[in-house]
Regions:
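Hydrophobic membrane-insertion alpha-helices, especially the h-region
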Residues: 35-52
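Signal peptide cleavage region of secreted peptide precursors
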Residues: 54-58
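Soluble "head" domains of membrane/secretory-pathway proteins
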Residues: 1-30, 64, 68-205
Length: 205
């Protein structure tokens, strides 16, 4: 009877020892946590690379919305420019990357009147509260589009957009024959967030 009791006690103790063996050590738990953390960071970076990119503002053509050397995040995955978007594009004519605001898309008629300081798209006046000052007709704009002493009319062609800088008096944009209409294949994405300087962090509109 004593032998049977000892055998039973030994069998009961065996699972306890097995459980003790299976319990991970603090080091194993730490390594598992680190592995999960690294994997999560990898996934986040992968998503960021495919969905977003960063760009640095160069110059004053988007003042007062954007300023020189600010850092922006733009989304580019499956992106189609829309009116009002702040877009980033390659300009083959200027041989540089430019940041402007999309005013018109393919098929739109854009009229800029410097006398009334207005921009209309398909006959509708834009609310441009983001402008810092009145527009001046002081540049050598492409005269092909001039329809009166103070106004210009642009018909946006297929696969193109018409874009302007928010700082209209210091911006080379679609009014300039050196830039013209921007082909959508040259649009890199839409600027959605300003992340630097940190005290100016915020969503763009």
């Amino acid at each position: 009877t004593n032998d049977l009791s000892k055998k039973g006690a030994a069998e009961n103790a065996k699972p306890e020892r097995d459980n003790e063996k299976k319990k991970p050590s603090p080091l194993d738990e730490a390594l598992d946590w680190i592995e999960s953390f690294v994997f999560a960071i990898f996934i986040v970076l992968l998503v960021f690379i495919f969905l977003f990119r960063t760009v640095v503002v160069d110059g004053s053509s988007m003042n007062p919305t954007l300023y020189d050397q600010q850092r922006l995040i733009l989304t580019h995955f499956n992106y189609t420019p829309e009116r009002g978007d702040i877009i980033v594009a390659n300009s083959p004519q200027l041989n540089k990357t430019i940041i402007k605001r999309c005013i018109g898309v393919a098929g739109d008629t854009v009229v800029i009147d410097y006398n009334t300081n207005t921009v209309t798209v398909n006959g509708e006046k834009l609310d441009e509260s983001y402008l810092g000052e009145a527009m001046l007709d002081k540049f050598s704009f492409d005269q092909e589009y001039k329809v009166s002493e103070t106004s210009y009319e642009y018909h946006v062609p297929k696969n193109c957009i018409f874009a302007l800088g928010d700082n209209r008096n210091d911006s080379r944009d679609s009014r300039d024959e050196g830039v013209g209409f921007i082909n959508t294949k040259n649009v890199l994405g839409k600027a959605v967030l300003r992340f630097y300087p940190f005290d100016q962090f915020g969503k763009l509109s």
